[in-house]
């Protein structure tokens, strides 16, 4: 959920979104992380905590401004920062965690909660809530529950987003398509055909590797990508999904996979290879930055004309279980999710603010971010939002495998049958670990 999801892994440092969701980055603005485990202290009572995240340089600039506000309010707490691109962040974090040297506080996503809880890395912040150092009041749409696993508060959400179909609005206009809430997958297929036939462009960039989209499709049909301890679908289910995708690539309904690979890190949508792309709603800002067209948000297609299977995803902040400064870390997280000035600085960089105070403090005036807010509000009003799918230990590895193997299938390196077999083999190993 940008959260670190499919699109994020494909985006590069100069093309990634500048004001929304989960973005990629290169190494650091400001101070870098200390080499010792946990935070540090000084003789005058000042403590230093380490804070790491994945994100673009624009995100780093915003975060550094919020840290300056925090240090002004809490002059005895200093914050040292470190950030990398998404994949590099998790490689480094895994190494740090294995060596007992992770940052005191760090950006996180739901796919990693059980993994690092099982490794005794994550602090249960519930104790800090009870101590009055962290408030879980005032969150929108039940988002305060998002970081709870097995009764433990392992993460605090900082921004919400949801899956959407991002469309090239002029292309859809030329094709005569007006997606509406409740449209079906058959309607979607017809729309892709019209885009191809009337504009000469592929209808979609290729949805086959987007794990979170397939999860919605499964949820529409009474299943889910994950259960509490494994996969929630069969090889036959995935064969049907990827066979449909393979046909779409061959017929030109989905963008040429070779061309999509060639233009990375730019998206197929902003590169004008396709008329739409399934991703997190806040990636609209990325496409606006990358491309020359006007982009909008369309509803997720449905199986029965009603259920979309959607939920609000979120980036979150988590803490190291053995941090030397749990109180200060909790105060830092509390400040970052509740302070109105933080919202004004961050905007929708990490999604729509999760607390009502921050949501009210930042009301966008530009059309792109206004559309993102309106889209999420429409989901709440339509009553389509459900509880998020569980993410067992190993979910992050399954997500990466799903994307990689789907791309290999689309490129012709694997047959559908081989791709399905390979995914289930890798997932079985990941989820057993």
For each predicted feature, which ranges?
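Extracytoplasmic/periplasmic substrate-recognition and gating elements
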Residues: 68-73, 175, 243, 250-254, ...
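Hinge/lid segment of periplasmic solute-binding proteins
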Residues: 110-162, 296-298, 367-370
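N-terminal secretory signal peptides
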Residues: 1-11, 22-31
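Glycine-centered hinge/linker elements that transmit conformational signals in sensory
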Residues: 192, 230-258
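C-terminal capping/gating helix-and-loop segments adjacent to ligand/active sites or protein-protein/ligand interfaces
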Residues: 373-426
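Mature extracytoplasmic/periplasmic domains
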Residues: 285, 315-396
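Extracytoplasmic "Venus flytrap"/periplasmic binding protein-like
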Residues: 69, 73-138, 174-176, 266-276, ...
């Amino acid at each position: 959920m940008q959260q670190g999801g499919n699109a994020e892994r494909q985006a590069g440092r100069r093309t990634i979104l500048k004001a929304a969701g989960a973005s990629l980055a290169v190494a650091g603005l400001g101070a870098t992380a200390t080499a010792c485990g946990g935070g540090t202290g000084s003789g005058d009572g000042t403590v230093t905590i380490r804070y790491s995240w994945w994100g673009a340089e624009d995100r780093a600039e915003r975060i550094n401004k919020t840290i300056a506000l925090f240090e002004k309010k809490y002059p005895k707490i200093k914050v040292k920062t470190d950030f990398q691109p998404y994949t590099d962040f998790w490689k480094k974090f895994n190494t740090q965690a294995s060596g007992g040297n992770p940052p005191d506080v760090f950006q996180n996503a739901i796919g990693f909660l059980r993994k690092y809880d099982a490794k005794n890395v994550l602090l249960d912040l519930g104790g800090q809530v009870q101590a009055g150092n962290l408030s879980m009041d005032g969150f929108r749409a039940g988002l305060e529950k998002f970081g709870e696993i097995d009764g433990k508060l392992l993460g605090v959400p900082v921004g919400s987003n949801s899956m959407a179909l991002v469309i090239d609005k002029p292309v859809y206009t030329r094709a005569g398509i007006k997606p509406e809430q409740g449209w079906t997958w058959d309607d979607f297929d017809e729309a892709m055909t019209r885009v191809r036939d009337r504009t000469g462009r592929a209808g979609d960039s290729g949805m086959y590797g987007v794990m979170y989209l397939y999860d919605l499709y499964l949820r529409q049909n009474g299943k889910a990508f994950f259960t509490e301890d494994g996969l929630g679908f069969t090889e036959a289910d995935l064969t049907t999904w990827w066979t449909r995708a393979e046909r779409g690539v061959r017929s030109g309904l989905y963008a040429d996979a070779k061309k999509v690979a060639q233009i990375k890190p730019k998206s197929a949508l902003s590169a004008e290879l396709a008329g739409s792309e399934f991703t997190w709603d806040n990636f609209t800002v990325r496409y606006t930055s990358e491309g020359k067209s006007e982009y909008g948000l369309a509803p997720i297609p449905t199986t029965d004309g009603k259920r979309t299977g959607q939920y609000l995803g979120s980036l979150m902040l988590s803490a190291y279980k053995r941090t030397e400064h749990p109180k200060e870390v909790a105060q830092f997280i509390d400040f970052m999710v509740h302070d109105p000035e933080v919202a004004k600085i961050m905007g929708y960089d990490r999604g729509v603010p999760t607390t009502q105070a921050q949501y009210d403090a930042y009301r966008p005036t530009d059309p792109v971010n206004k559309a993102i807010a309106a889209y999420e509000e429409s989901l709440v009003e339509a009553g389509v939002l459900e509880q998020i799918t569980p993410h067992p230990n190993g979910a992050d590895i399954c997500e990466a495998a799903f994307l990689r193997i789907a791309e290999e299938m689309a490129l012709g390196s694997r047959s559908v049958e081989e791709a399905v077999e390979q995914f289930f083999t890798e997932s079985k190993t990941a989820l057993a670990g």
